Amino acid sequence: MIDAKTCINDAQEKMDMAVMYLEEALAHIRAGKASTRLLDGIRVDSYGSMVPISNVAAVTTPDARSIAIKPWDKSMFRIIEKAIMDSDLGITPENNGEIIRLGIPPLTEERRKQLAKQCKGEGETAKVSIRNARRDAIDTLKKAVKEGMPEDEQKNAEAKLQKVHDKYIAKIEELLAEKDKEIMTV
């Protein structure tokens, strides 16, 4: 028989994963200032395998409006440039032979609104995952009642589950509010 604590812990793990997914997704959304994390999702072909740019070059942010990429192998310049151009960053790399520089342009009001909308979409995806985890746990608890779990224990577990759910939804709202503030700050 499944006990309530295990059921709640399993749901909490799934909810943690949803929050981690959201944090990762929000980190890749450009908020107007330079961050090396913008390049985390971009992979380049290095000797037959696809690797992150940070594995083949030093990636730094010399100031708030630019990212500098210094490849360790000169043959990687073109490959890195192409990967950045093919990505959905919307930034054109400048290559001076020594360093690839990415100038982060200030965001227009329209682009800020698009990014805020994209953040809300990612937040909704995470909320749906959390709700699904809660629903699955409640279904498991209902099956456990049929297998002999006392109904009082089930009701208490559902109440705890709701509190956990509310905590995670609040965490998502907090993350979204932070990112929205970051995006909308000129």
From Swiss-Prot:
<keyword id="KW-0963">Cytoplasm</keyword>
<dbReference type="InterPro" id="IPR036191">
    <property type="entry name" value="RRF_sf"/>
</dbReference>
<protein>
    <recommendedName>
        <fullName>Ribosome-recycling factor</fullName>
    </recommendedName>
</protein>
<keyword id="KW-0648">Protein biosynthesis</keyword>
<dbReference type="GO" id="GO:0043023">
    <property type="term" value="F:ribosomal large subunit binding"/>
</dbReference>
<dbReference type="InterPro" id="IPR002661">
    <property type="entry name" value="Ribosome_recyc_fac"/>
</dbReference>
<comment type="similarity">
    <text>Belongs to the RRF family.</text>
</comment>
<comment type="function">
    <text>Responsible for the release of ribosomes from messenger RNA at the termination of protein biosynthesis. May increase the efficiency of translation by recycling ribosomes from one round of translation to another.</text>
</comment>
<dbReference type="Pfam" id="PF01765">
    <property type="entry name" value="RRF"/>
</dbReference>
<dbReference type="InterPro" id="IPR023584">
    <property type="entry name" value="Ribosome_recyc_fac_dom"/>
</dbReference>
<dbReference type="GO" id="GO:0005737">
    <property type="term" value="C:cytoplasm"/>
</dbReference>
<dbReference type="GO" id="GO:0006415">
    <property type="term" value="P:translational termination"/>
</dbReference>
